[in-house]
Design a protein with these regions (language model features):
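Surface-exposed, extracytoplasmic segments of Gram-negative outer-membrane nutrient-acquisition systems
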Residues: 1-14, 48-115, 124, 133-238, ...
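Repeated loop/turn-to-beta-strand initiation elements of outer-membrane beta-barrel proteins
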Residues: 34-35, 131-136, 258-259
Length: 320
């Protein structure tokens, strides 16, 4: 179309996604006396697949959101697939290193996971006795992946505790030197005594990989160079997004009916509530995996997010 028309783009309601899922709820009362115990379970799972992106089938993929890794809708893949740079591997799955001993990057972006969980669920326990009730909610999300941008940046800058190994001899660092004190000559491991006049460093790390010809890597990298490598390889910063949380604890008291009759009230209850109290289990490091999941398209991509917060409150419910 000629540029003279002024037309540049058009928004379309396009694309087809196939979703198949299940949702179930179950409530039981194990104890029903003066003391009552109620338990409510819920479970949900969904499987999606992108069928098409446009009616003319001109598109095979579409970038939904980007950080370093990207969320790309691709025909044949689950919606929410994460794509990014990955380690270069041989036929046996071993990571291949380059001439310096650093991990090599696959020239083609790879599917690194999907941000949608395999399943989610929760258990709500309510314990009641003589007008006092205690509610405890534990919920969980299992499966799915997250790009941890905080980990990527923290590893690159060396501010995380996970970058401590290898930074000095007392932390497992390997001693090495540069022949002639020229870094262009590459690193050489100190075996016994180093040559006279060279500077010896003790922050060496050997990446666990193989050379292009399949031999075990023996090249030493300075710790700083070693840790900086991973920022540019998205696969190194992909984590399992599963978690289990103590989501809510609520302690309630229902005022006796005899106190309410003079006020013509049907019921009054006072509750103390705490939310997001404890991450019981998570597979991410340094962040709450939930911070990367919102209502937008950029789910599964996290970058230097603020910590999640606990909240406490008082509820007053009055029935007239």
């Amino acid at each position: 179309m000629s540029q003279s028309t002024g037309f540049s783009s058009k928004l379309l309601n396009a694309g087809k996604i196939n979703n198949k899922g299940i949702e179930a709820q179950l409530g039981i009362t194990p104890v029903k006396k003066a003391f009552t115990w109620d338990v409510d379970f819920n479970f949900a799972a969904n499987r999606s697949r992108v069928i098409e992106l446009d009616a003319e089938k001109l598109l095979t993929n579409y970038v939904v959101a980007t950080n370093s890794a990207q969320v790309i809708a691709t025909v044949g893949q689950p919606y929410g697939s994460l794509f990014g740079t990955a380690f270069l591997r041989d036929g046996n799955g071993n990571i291949i290193v380059n001439a310096t001993g650093a991990p090599a990057t696959n020239p083609t972006k790879q599917v690194l996971g999907k941000y949608t969980p395999d399943w989610i669920g929760g258990v709500y326990n309510t314990f009641s006795y003589k007008g006092i009730s205690l509610g405890v909610l534990v919920d969980a999300s299992f499966g799915g992946s997250i790009y941890n941008g905080t980990y990527a940046t923290g590893t690159y800058t060396g501010v995380l505790a996970s970058t401590l190994p290898g930074r000095a001899a007392e932390y497992g660092g390997i001693s090495y030197y540069y022949p002639g004190n020229d870094k262009a000559n590459g690193t050489v491991r100190v075996n016994g005594t180093a040559p006279t006049g060279v500077t010896v460093y003790d922050d060496g790390i050997i990446f666990d990989g193989v050379t292009a010809d399949g031999k075990r890597n023996e090249k030493i990298l300075p710790a700083q160079q070693y840790y900086k490598t991973f920022r540019n390889i998205d696969e190194a910063n992909i984590f399992d997004a599963s978690y289990v949380k103590l989501r809510e604890v609520k302690l309630s008291y229902n005022l006796p009916a005899k106190w309410l009759r003079p006020l013509s009230l049907q019921g009054v209850s006072v509750s103390l509530v705490g939310r997001n109290l404890w991450i019981i289990h998570r597979n991410t490091v340094d962040i709450d995996p939930e911070v990367a999941f919102n209502t937008g398209n950029g789910q599964g991509l996290e970058s230097l997010s603020n910590p999640s917060t606990r909240s406490y409150g008082i509820n007053l419910n009055v029935k007239f």
